[in-house]
Amino acid sequence: MKKIKNSYKKSGVNISLANKLVKHISKVSKKDVKKTKNSFNKEIIGGFGSLFDISKNKIKDPVIVSCTDGVGTKLALENKFKKFDTIGIDLVAMCVNDLIVQGAKPLFFLDYIAVGKLNLKKTKSILKGIFKGCELSDCKLIGGETAEMPGIYSKDKFDLAGFSVGIVSKKKILNKYNVKKNDVVLAIPSSGIHSNGYSLVRSILKKNKISKNLKNELIKPTKIYSKEILYLTKKNLINSSAHITGGGLIENLLRSIPDNLTLNIDLSKIKTTKIFKWL
């Protein structure tokens, strides 16, 4: 029998390993379907496209909201500290938190994982976090893509991207034009740095020592605010909302109010956590 000179595996792409990962995802997904009983059909998992039944969401004048995002250079720290089981929570949070500030209830999520060389243990750990993030935000992971790309990424490097979809009634959409003079600004505490500003964080880390406890704070997962924001919107207690990401308080809050209004924030009322003091 003639030997094959060229193969995908020799070029750096392990299809057999990728198939094992797909089987793992399918197995975990089916368990999630049985637990939640809120999916189109557990037998359709593994198809070319992902299906989701929206008929159970009895929302008047429904509007679909979609968001996509990544985790940025926080990935470099996760790689450095060999901590992969919470970065998936970060990924879901970065997408879902953009949905809920418009009043949308998260419905489903899709992920994209790009790697230089597929490591089954590492990828399963990342996916564990993604499933956890979906659980925390009460949405379903219904699909995704894992791409092994030798030559684009070195063997231990990877990148993540997420895509989320939510639903909101047209009358319940939060936007800056709902804001009126004398409205009160409410702040919901963060869990730490979240997933922005890590190029600066890593630059500081190169020049300064950090304790083990604070090191753990650096990779603490981004908080998911679904329950808090959706509770407030259900009670009609908020007019607009802002997800504080790149640009910080100033840039993001200005996106949530009309041009003819200004904000007055008493920063002395905001408790500064240890990690921000270190920075």
Where do the protein language model's features map onto the residues?
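Structured alpha-helical segments in the cores of large, soluble enzyme domains
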Residues: 91-102, 229, 275-279
